């Protein structure tokens, strides 16, 4: 059994019982590709393991025009669709509730210009490599749409989204740091038409923002990419730290219900297996 079929069976088997829908045939299973030292070999390995897509993790020093050409060639040769370029720029990003709101993404003003420069370089690489989208954690979007901080963020994101739209690149918001309705509101208020969602339901749980099924129902066709990752809600006894990531299916993400809802909505994107538990990501994929 290929890794692709193994993961599909283990993670979402209950949701796939019943008639096979046409939309399912267009869904690809992929991973986040971190190593780009030999992209041809990496894509060859992914294809042989049964994957059909991947996300590329951005590194400013390595992502050159030469690499972009290599990515295009390897993608065509090995039939691996690169769905997004992912990165979270900034030297101070802290993944908790104490410092996170002041350090992650474009909501805080500290390092904002430097982050915007990196985001524009990511968009440029997407153009060079033929990648349709980039995505990131853009910060803890304020819940109050009348706040100065919210309005400032909307203006900054509109500028970045316009830069991407002019180059025919989409931007996906990685979920987690705000409630689903706040993210939907922000996308509407920015209003450039090229903003969508990379839906990471484990993040929404780990940040305590939503349960998995409600989030998918709310996001609807804004979801272009889906991260297969599992997690737990934050510990009420320690409300300053995120919940824990745990192996699929030992967390609180209701994968059978979620996959069924995605199929109902006609989802045709990629399900990307993400693992931040350790460095042996392919081992995790096999063991899941």
Which sequence ranges carry the predicted segments?
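N-terminal pre-domain/capping segments
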Residues: 2-3, 8, 20-121, 127, ...
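Short secondary-structure transition/capping segments
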Residues: 66-69, 95-98, 146-149, 184-186, ...
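Histidine-acidic metal/acid-base catalytic patches
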Residues: 4, 24-28, 39-47, 180-195, ...
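Hydrophobic h-region of N-terminal signal peptides that target proteins for export
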Residues: 13-20
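A short acidic, helix-capping loop that chelates divalent metal ions and anchors anionic groups
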Residues: 93-95, 105, 142-146, 206-207, ...
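Charged helix-capping and loop-helix junction motifs
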Residues: 67-71, 146-158, 209-217, 251-254
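Active-site acidic/histidine proton-transfer and metal-coordination neighborhood
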Residues: 40, 96-196
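Active-site beta-loop-alpha junctions enriched in small/polar residues
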Residues: 32-36, 57-59, 87-90, 139-141, ...
């Amino acid at each position: 059994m290929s890794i692709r079929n193994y993961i599909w069976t283990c993670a979402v088997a209950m949701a796939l019982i019943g008639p096979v829908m046409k939309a399912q045939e267009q869904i690809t299973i992929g991973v986040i590709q971190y190593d780009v030292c030999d992209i041809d070999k990496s894509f060859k390995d992914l294809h042989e393991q049964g994957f059909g897509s991947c996300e590329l993790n951005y590194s400013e020093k390595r992502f050159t025009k030469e690499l972009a050409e290599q990515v295009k060639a390897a993608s065509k040769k090995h039939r691996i669709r690169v769905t997004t370029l992912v990165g979270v720029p900034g030297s101070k990003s802290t993944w908790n509730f104490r410092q996170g709101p002041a350090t992650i993404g474009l909501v805080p003003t500290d390092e904002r210009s430097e982050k915007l420069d990196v985001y524009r370089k990511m968009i440029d690489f997407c153009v060079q490599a033929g990648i349709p989208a980039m995505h990131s954690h853009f910060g803890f979007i304020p819940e109050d749409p009348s706040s100065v901080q919210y309005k400032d963020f909307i203006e900054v994101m509109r500028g970045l989204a316009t830069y991407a739209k002019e180059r025919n690149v989409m931007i996906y918001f990685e979920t987690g740091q705000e409630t689903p309705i706040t993210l939907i509101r922000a996308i509407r208020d920015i209003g450039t038409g090229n903003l969508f969602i990379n839906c990471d339901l484990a993040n929404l749980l780990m940040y305590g923002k939503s349960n998995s099924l409600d989030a998918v129902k709310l996001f609807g066709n804004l979801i272009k990419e889906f991260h297969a990752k599992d997690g737990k809600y934050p510990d009420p006894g320690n409300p300053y730290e995120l919940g824990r990531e745990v192996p699929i299916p030992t967390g609180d993400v209701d994968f059978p219900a979620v996959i069924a809802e995605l199929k109902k909505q006609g989802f045709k994107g990629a399900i990307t297996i993400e693992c931040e538990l350790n460095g042996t990501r392919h081992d995790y994929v096999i063991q899941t």
